[in-house]
Amino acid sequence: MKKKVFFLAASAIMLAMGSCTNDVLDNVQQVDSSLPQTRATASNNWTYAYVLSEGTWHVAPPSSPGSIVRYDNNWTKKSTLEIGDTGNDLIQYGSKLYCAVSGHDLTADNGGIWVLNAKTGQLLTPQMKQYDDEKTGHKAMPRHLAAANGKVYISFYSGAVMSIDTMNYAKVNYLELDATYSEGICVGKDNKIYVCNSGNTDDTQAGEGTTISVLPLTLDDETQITVPKNPKLIAAYSANKMYFNVLGDGGMHSALYKFNPTTPNVAPTLVTEKAGGFAIGSQYLYTADIDWNTTDYKTIMQKVQLSNDDTSDFTDDPGIYVRFQRNSQSI
């Protein structure tokens, strides 16, 4: 399972990122300007934490459902919301939380979006909102979320993108991409949508994709940037620097890359290897990865100085670690 943590206060939010590596980061902020600043876990200057757990991923139904757990700042559990098969992403935009539930697969028809009041944790939708995916003829399989200008943008695993209105949650725009198995999504500083594609147009399984799609906010056109294989997450740091990571395959380590969106034809530059997940802070970008070739699944955490991309270990403190179990985790 993977988990995401939001520390919610008047102007505070901390995200412990989720990816296939179950990474845990401290003092990390979302790049989206709609999100408040972060707080360290050692500080109690926050009101609630929201923890997203994906549940049991891609096992024969019935699977263990994903959940959103709400804690107070004494880490007392206040509520648990079961959200269905595979909770995949959780963002705050304005006064609301949006949660993407992928569902079991592309034809399972059990994926959708939950909307919650960020202050109270109460549902704002009586049931999960589901959307038709014209590319598959089934209900959409949402993967990741971004937000801007009163809309939430959703990447679909089929290789499509949809925007929804934040007032009534109705579909606004939709575009089928020249790709499949779309994953991470963000809004660039140039007000364009960037989507990582884990599959190319005719791929029948994820992992071989080599493109990032670039779209206007209206989702009525698509261009592509060629990148190393299997891009996963993406974030904008500045007008001329964006970061993304790739998961590669069994023969290649994960890695972090950067590129300049103003010169999309210039090949991305490798920043560091071993980056299964990442998030951007005020001075550093933080990465986390698991070395699956070690018997104890060694956790690798690095920080990248945003001014010059110098990379160093995130911490030598043996008290900071990630523990994994089959059906539960400590973070």
Regions found by a protein language model. Give the residues of each.
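Repeated scaffold domains used in trafficking and secretory/extracellular systems
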Residues: 34-41, 84-94, 134-147, 179-188, ...
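Structural motif
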Residues: 58-69, 106-115, 160-163, 202-213, ...
